[in-house]
Amino acid sequence: MNHLDRLERKIGYRFNDIALLKQALTHRSAATQHNERLEFLGDSILNFTIAEALYHQFPRCNEGELSRMRATLVREPTLAILARQFELGDYMSLGSGELKNGGFRRESILADCVEAIIGAMSLDQGLAVTTQVIRNWYQQLLAEIKPGDNQKDAKTRLQEYLQGKHLPLPTYEVVNIQGEAHCQIFTVKCKVKSAEKIDRTFVAKGSSRRKAEQAAAEQILKELDIK
């Protein structure tokens, strides 16, 4: 049994075209044939699958409640938890710089890899099979999630924290866009004023402006120890 056989057992899916899995595991720092296009595809499929599951699971919840629960289930820390369960860091291909910087442990890289695997599965065996695999991954998380105030994305939590401290709201600015139109990487700069009235700047990347802004907000919440 080779190392990718072991990974397939962990994720509960057997690829017909193993090259798709290899590409999904390849970070842009390692090769030109990397996983960002697959990540783009997987992000959309994941959001749809979780949205549909929540729609049927919570027939009395409104759009806002469903959106907040979905945001919790598809956000970077949740995907990174799944990645660690699969031990994806042991299978990823990273460039030497990312390896030295511990990229195989970085939440953003792990989360992106999960989405890329989803994209790869959809190309390998189609949407129906892929959505069932995702539901298997999320079985416990879906069983545990409940509508409520704790289901808020990073940007919302950061905004509410700053408002509670009577501090200015964060500002988000796209400072760079790389790649072709169908496969872009957005770099976002977020500025906040801390409780000590000190200006702080955080930079994050994502495959969409929304994901980059959420990643920056998550970074701030961790750095400033905001629960």
Swiss-Prot record:
Residues annotated to bind Mg(2+): E39, D112, E115
Pfam families: dsrm (PF00035), Ribonucleas_3_3 (PF14622)
Main location: cytoplasm
GO biological process: mRNA processing; regulation of gene expression; RNA processing; rRNA processing; tRNA processing
InterPro entries per UniProt: dsRBD_dom, RNase_III, RNase_III_dom, RNase_III_sf
Domain DRBM: from-to ranges: 153-226
Keyword field: Cytoplasm, Endonuclease, Hydrolase, Magnesium, Metal-binding, mRNA processing, Nuclease, RNA-binding, rRNA processing, rRNA-binding, tRNA processing
The protein's required cofactors: Mg(2+)
Catalytic activity: Endonucleolytic cleavage to 5'-phosphomonoester
Subcellular location: Cytoplasm
Domain RNase III: 4-126
Record-level GO cellular component terms: cytosol
PROSITE patterns reported in the protein's UniProt record: DS_RBD, RNASE_3_1, RNASE_3_2
Keyword Nucleotide-binding attached: no
Quaternary organization: Homodimer.
Function according to Swiss-Prot or TrEMBL: Digests double-stranded RNA. Involved in the processing of primary rRNA transcript to yield the immediate precursors to the large and small rRNAs (23S and 16S). Processes some mRNAs, and tRNAs when they are encoded in the rRNA operon. Processes pre-crRNA and tracrRNA of type II CRISPR loci if present in the organism.
Name of this protein: Ribonuclease 3
Source organism: Haemophilus influenzae (strain ATCC 51907 / DSM 11121 / KW20 / Rd)
Source organism phylogeny: Bacteria, Pseudomonadati, Pseudomonadota, Gammaproteobacteria, Pasteurellales
Gene designation per UniProt: rnc
